[in-house]
């Protein structure tokens, strides 16, 4: 079974996966990457109004086979903005 590596970027730091996990296909890797994004966002809430979280998936040869991103945008409602 192929091994995939999930590198994460939270807007401030890149964490490279050196262990990886064995999955049946790139499609299964896509599902795992999508599941990881909400956890990344929860662990590193945006300091400002917007932040993008990225999971890059590499195969055993080191080639990026897919990339998933989640952007969190925080906007204050017009009635609640400071004057």
Where are these regions (language model features)?
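Long, contiguous binding/interaction regions
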Residues: 22, 42, 81-82
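C-terminal structural segments of small proteins and small subunits
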Residues: 46-83
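Short aromatic-glycine-(Arg/Gly/Cys) micro-motifs in beta-strand/loop hairpins
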Residues: 1-16
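A short, exposed loop/beta-hairpin motif centered on an aromatic-Gly-Thr core
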Residues: 15-24
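Charged, amphipathic alpha-helical segments
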Residues: 30-43
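A short, structured loop/turn motif at beta-sheet edges
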Residues: 1, 23-28, 59-63
